[in-house]
Design a protein with these regions (language model features):
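Peri-transmembrane interface segments
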Residues: 4, 199-203, 209-215, 221-257
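Membrane-proximal extracellular/periplasmic loop immediately following the first transmembrane helix
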Residues: 2-84, 89, 194
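Stable alpha-helical elements in mature extracytoplasmic
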Residues: 40-44, 99-102, 211, 245
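Residues at or immediately flanking beta-strands
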Residues: 19-21, 57, 115, 148, ...
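Hydrophobic alpha-helical segments typical of transmembrane helices
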Residues: 8, 43-44, 183, 241, ...
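Short beta-strand boundary microenvironments
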Residues: 50-138, 158, 179
Length: 257
């Protein structure tokens, strides 16, 4: 239990501090029951650009479920493995959607090539940036930049590789870098649920508190009551919640023993 808790703490730390979690819920449907909820991200993105004194970046926090193929490598045939503490140590790459500010929000730096760009989002470019572990598993010693991945049959060009965040000998931390990040507009071809979760990266803890107040006020005027709701809070809320959960489980198991 302590091993799993320590590993999760390391993973939270690797994503960086001063992150704000934004959730926007909407329940608007037409007469046929189709979801016609508004996409709030463009408005939220533009608003956060005006908060540069406090905010470094903003990105959707969502993922895709797709098969990735390069040569003989196929994500659908990769086996998921866990260590004795039930930490994920190997498996297929995780697939994420992001804005041009995804790396800033997740404590990532580009080691090769380039990052996602604003025009990639606007022009629906079929490009991606991959993590260091994904590059190793799919490409070995070959430079991935410029290579093409097949993702559910669609071509996506690798434009960059993120530097490793995990230790070389820590398989669970390396798994954090086993990932592919697509422009969030790629969801039109790869699918996935409508975005409801977003991450805002603040400059420091004081700026995070200020951003929470400003963004909350902005969303109050943007999300109509009766057909939607929102929540803005420090992203380490989940870290605190996990710590409390692990402590409670430990107390229960200790009582049983």
């Amino acid at each position: 239990m302590e091993g799993m808790k320590a590993q999760m703490m390391k993973q939270f730390s690797a994503m960086g501090a001063n992150r704000v979690q934004v959730s926007i819920y909407s329940w608007m449907y037409d007469a046929d029951g189709n979801d016609v909820s508004k996409d709030y991200f463009p408005d939220l993105y533009e608003y956060c650009q005006g908060l540069r004194e406090y905010v470094i970046g903003i990105t959707p926090n969502g993922g895709a479920n797709a098969t990735v193929i390069y040569g003989t490598k196929n994500s659908s045939t990769m086996q998921t493995e866990y260590d004795k503490q039930w930490n994920l140590i190997s498996g297929p790459p995780s697939l994420y959607y992001g804005s041009d500010q995804y790396s800033a929000c997740n404590n990532l730096t580009v080691a090769k090539g380039r990052d996602l760009a604003y025009l990639d989002i606007q022009n629906y470019n079929q490009v991606c940036v991959i993590g260091a572990e994904m590059a190793k598993q799919f490409f070995g010693t070959v430079d991935p930049v410029g290579k093409t991945l097949k993702v559910n049959g669609n071509n996506f060009t690798v434009v960059g590789v993120y530097a490793a965040r995990g230790d070389e000998g820590d398989n669970s931390m390396k798994q954090m870098d086993n990932m592919v990040v697509f422009p969030y507009t790629a969801s039109r071809v790869l699918g996935g649920a409508r975005f409801t979760e977003y991450i805002v990266k603040a400059r420091d803890s004081e700026s995070a508190n200020t951003a929470i107040a400003y963004i909350g006020g902005f969303l109050k005027g943007l999300v109509p009551q009766g057909s939607g709701d929102y929540e803005v809070r420090a992203a380490d809320y989940w870290q605190q919640y996990q710590n409390e959960s692990f402590n409670m489980i430990g107390m229960v198991l200790g009582g049983i023993a």
